[in-house]
């Protein structure tokens, strides 16, 4: 909404922004799923009768409603990741920041969690991801910002970033191998080739 957050307190920012850590085991602190998702609301002093419907809604969105009364220890790593996301969604943030959302996951769980985040984004939640996974960046992010030495050096689509040799070099990134292929075989506009390839891949395997 174009708001400058510099003048806001941490408490004020926390009502707008949710943060999900890379490892859910470092974030989860309650043994039961319901209590974990309800924790933030209880800390804010929300009445118990108001908490349950908010928790139920967050669990439903995250596909965890059947596990409401389960212990967290019974879940897979990917499901635990969703519990941490649900705990943030229960607080109704406008922006969700995720640190390496697919770290340590196989292709199946990688796809599952990214498709889930894509759906959340389509429902109106702004998603910001911190990632070193360049394929994920190409496949799922319409917009990318590159930071090097504490300064923003790139602000464009993921395809434009990863087909820009100057930005990639300054940030110690590699241009995508698709870009290298396009250059090698003499394609006039490598960025268009890369985008078309990614679009085709998504259409084929989803």
PLM regions: where:
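ABC ATPase NBD Q-loop/coupling interface
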Residues: 1-12
């Amino acid at each position: 909404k174009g708001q400058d957050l510099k003048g806001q307190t941490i408490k004020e920012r926390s009502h707008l922004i949710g943060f999900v850590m890379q490892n859910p085991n470092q974030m989860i602190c309650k043994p039961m799923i319901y209590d974990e998702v309800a924790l933030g609301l209880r800390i804010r002093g929300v009445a118990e009768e108001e908490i349950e419907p908010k928790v139920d809604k967050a669990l439903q969105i995250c596909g965890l409603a059947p596990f409401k009364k389960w212990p967290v220890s019974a879940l897979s790593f990917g499901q635990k990741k969703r519990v941490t996301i649900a705990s943030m969604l229960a607080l109704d943030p406008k922006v969700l920041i995720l640190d390496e959302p697919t770290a340590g996951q196989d292709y199946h769980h990688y796809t599952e969690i990214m498709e889930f985040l894509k759906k959340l984004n389509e429902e109106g939640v702004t998603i910001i991801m911190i990632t070193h996974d360049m394929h994920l960046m190409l496949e799922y992010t319409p917009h990318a910002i590159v930071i090097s030495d504490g300064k923003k050096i790139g602000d464009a689509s993921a395809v434009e970033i990863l087909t820009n040799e100057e930005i990639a070099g300054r940030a110690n990134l590699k241009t995508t191998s698709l870009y290298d292929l396009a250059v090698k075989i003499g394609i006039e506009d490598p960025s268009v080739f890369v985008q078309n390839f990614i679009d085709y891949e998504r259409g084929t395997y989803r």
